[in-house]
């Protein structure tokens, strides 16, 4: 569970990026945070992950031990950045996924167990010895997710996870996200392009100019998106029910 109260963040140049955000994210929830570029989405994610310190307000995080992770010691939260290359530090796929659990100080047998589990879950076992620079965009995104999973977080943050991916890669990453949600992980996804994921989320939160404007079930939120510079999904524009990108 994540409880955010009266959250403010100012950058050194004076930009007031977040203005009094109040938001509660339940355990096991799949939450979509959407907003136009510059709305404050990424700032909020970096505050939740602990990369930034809020100017005012608080973030309280409570997370039980996940039962599907193969080890006990791990951080509560993992974040998959928009630019997957910024998270890749190893020469090969296996080395990169090993980096996190090794830095947690896990014994070698636990590192191997965690890495093998994450590689298997993300479908990377067959290319575990492949140099990272030879990976496709979709493979790099899956590698970034595997690197986070190997540390066993209960809560996973995805910042614009479909950015710069082609259609097959988007579908592949989306499938893995759905699997993680089904396994009980709490997922928080930010994007300005809601089309790809909205059919699968539990709730949608809209951020505009640093303020939380609305939050609720997807079907209630689609009619509010356009007034905040967010393109509604095609199914809503056509008056249809929610349609998954995995259909067809």
Q: Model-derived features: where do they sit?
A:
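Conserved ABC ATPase signature
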Residues: 131-135, 139
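Helix-to-loop junction immediately C-terminal to a conserved catalytic motif
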Residues: 49
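Conserved ABC ATPase "signature" region
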Residues: 109-127
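H-loop/switch region of ABC-family ATPase nucleotide-binding domains
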Residues: 191-192
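Catalytic Walker B motif of ABC-type/P-loop ATPase nucleotide-binding domains
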Residues: 156-159
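ABC ATPase nucleotide-binding domains
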Residues: 223-248
């Amino acid at each position: 569970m994540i409880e955010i109260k009266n959250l403010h963040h100012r950058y050194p140049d004076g930009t007031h990026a977040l203005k009094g955000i109040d938001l509660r994210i339940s355990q096991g929830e799949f939450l979509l945070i959407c907003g136009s570029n510059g709305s404050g989405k990424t700032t909020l994610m970096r505050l939740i992950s602990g990369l930034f310190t809020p100017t005012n307000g608080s973030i309280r995080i409570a997370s039980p031990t996940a039962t599907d992770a193969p080890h006990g010691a791990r951080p509560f939260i993992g974040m998959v950045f928009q630019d997957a290359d910024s998270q890749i530090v190893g020469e090969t796929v296996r080395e990169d996924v090993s980096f996190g659990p090794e830095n947690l100080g896990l014994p070698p047998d636990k590192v191997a167990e965690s890495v093998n589990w994450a590689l298997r879950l993300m479908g990377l076992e067959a290319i575990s010895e492949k140099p990272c620079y030879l990976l496709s965009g979709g493979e790099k995104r899956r590698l970034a997710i595997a690197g986070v999973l190997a540390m066993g977080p209960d809560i996973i943050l995805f910042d614009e996870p479909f950015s710069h991916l082609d259609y097959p890669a988007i579908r592949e990453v989306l499938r893995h996200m759905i699997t993680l949600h089904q396994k009980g992980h709490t997922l928080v996804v930010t994007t300005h392009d809601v089309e790809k994921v909205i059919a699968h989320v539990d709730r949608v939160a809209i951020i505009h100019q640093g303020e939380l404007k609305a939050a609720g079930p997807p079907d209630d939120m689609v009619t509010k998106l356009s007034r905040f510079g967010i393109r509604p999904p095609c199914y809503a524009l056509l008056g249809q029910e929610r349609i998954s990108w995995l259909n067809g």
